[in-house]
A protein has these predicted regions:
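Nucleotide/phosphate-binding site architecture used for ATP/NTP-dependent chemistry
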Residues: 7, 13-15, 52-53, 59, ...
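Short, solvent-exposed loop/turn segments at secondary-structure junctions
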Residues: 44-45, 51-53, 87, 96-99, ...
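ATP-binding glycine-rich phosphate-binding loop
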Residues: 2-41
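Conserved structural core of kinase catalytic domains
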Residues: 73-135
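Intrinsically disordered, low-complexity regulatory segments of kinases
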Residues: 128-138, 143-149
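ATP-binding glycine-rich loop module of kinase domains
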Residues: 25-71
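Conserved hydrophobic "DFG−1" position in protein kinase catalytic cores
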Residues: 39-40, 48, 83, 92-95, ...
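Catalytic-loop of the protein kinase fold
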Residues: 142-157, 162
Length: 166
């Protein structure tokens, strides 16, 4: 399922109405290839996904972390799952403050993707450059996620934030 901004917003409204909450559409927290994220009046975030595959991956990761009682990896806080709706492709999660790690729509559960060693080396070199001297902290967090069976490949500023970026 792919959808337009209007369709995502309509699904978010339907979700909010069913839950008895309001979404502040003026407070968009994020927008990307996976979907759009808005703030609710319950101080949670609602993410409307573009595709079923990203919804399923992200939901699976949040459920795994919840079942393990994990709310942070390394020094990074992770949102907790509040609710979800598979028909509407919506996930509601807690708001987090930096330092945080979020956006699991491109993560893999229990099995890493079948990338060649060259692709992985290029990916790591790009991330090392993006994060600079902070890369060891990011690498530690990714190691923790792997120990929980989550292979996270959307490491970029914005998804992994330290809180002192200027």
């Amino acid at each position: 399922m792919t959808s337009s901004f209007k369709e995502q917003k309509d699904r978010a409204i339907e979700y909010a109405d069913a839950r008895g909450i309001s979404i502040d559409f003026a407070r968009q927290l994020g927008y990307g290839n996976d979907g759009i994220v808005w703030v609710t009046d319950e101080f949670t975030a609602v993410k409307a996904f573009l595709r079923q595959s990203n919804y399923s991956r992200e939901l699976g990761c949040y459920q795994r972390l919840e079942n393990l009682g994990i709310g942070e990896v390394g020094t990074f806080e992770i949102p907790s799952l509040v609710d979800s709706d598979a028909k509407l492709l919506i996930i509601e999660m807690t708001l987090v403050t930096a330092p945080f790690l979020l956006d699991f729509g491109k993560a893999y559960l229990d099995q890493p993707p079948d990338y060649t060693p060259e692709v992985l080396a290029d990916w790591e070199a790009e991330r090392r450059e993006l994060f600079g001297n902070r890369w060891p902290q990011v690498l530690e967090a990714l190691g923790w996620l792997r120990s929980y069976g989550i292979y996270y490949y959307d490491a970029k500023p914005g998804n992994i934030t330290f809180g002192d970026e200027s």
